[in-house]
Regions:
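Conserved RNase H-like, two-metal-ion catalytic cores of nucleic-acid enzymes
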Residues: 1-65
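Metal-dependent phosphoesterase core characteristic of DEDDh/y 3'-5' exonuclease domains
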Residues: 23-42, 66-174
Length: 174
């Protein structure tokens, strides 16, 4: 839904009949704490154009099913709920139970920063920063542009590295 997400109406993708297109997962990236290996998956151009995220949902489901704790920034409100929506829409059972640590919640609860966005926190703590993106990246990925899908995968890998560093900085306050 669009409730409280403040998405400009110009950013809603519509089909040729003017109807809002259903959303799907383009990609994911994750890592185990202190492990240098970044795990990720992304739709192929054909999967993207068909809006078919089934294959990558299976791969992230498998990872979540192995996890005891999942760390995310706004993960409780966004990532986990979005994944659960895609799992149920694809008739997948939920992964095994896991706990979450939401660094956005920790930052809001423990500190009075001027912003709580992950990008702000990485800059504030002088940590590796997120790659810059624009809405057009998502549009191009949904159109199956392989170069842009590669950019999305790189964006996600950087995001995960930054998240780990933010988590480690905030962890003493958890």
């Amino acid at each position: 839904g669009l409730y409280k997400q403040f998405i400009p109406h110009t950013n809603i993708i519509k089909d040729e009949n003017g109807e809002e297109k259903s959303w799907f997962c383009l990609s994911w990236a994750a890592k185990w704490l202190y492990d240098d290996t970044i795990l990720s998956d992304i739709v192929t151009p054909d999967e993207s154009m068909a809006r078919n995220d089934g294959r990558i949902l299976k791969s992230i489901w498998k990872l979540l099913d192995e996890a005891d704790i999942v760390i995310g920034h706004n993960g409780d409100r966004f990532d986990i709920r979005k994944l659960n929506a895609r799992f149920i829409d694809n008739e997948m059972s939920p992964p095994s139970p896991f706990r979450t640590v939401d660094t956005l919640k920790v930052a809001r609860r423990e500190f009075a920063f001027v912003s709580y966005k992950q990008d702000f926190l990485t800059k504030h703590f002088k940590l590796p920063q997120k790659l810059s993106t624009e809405f057009q990246l998502w549009v191009d990925c949904m159109a199956g542009d392989q170069k842009r899908l590669d950019e999305m995968a790189e964006y996600n890998r950087h995001d995960v590295m930054g998240l780990e560093q933010v988590y480690l900085k905030l962890r003493p306050y958890i």
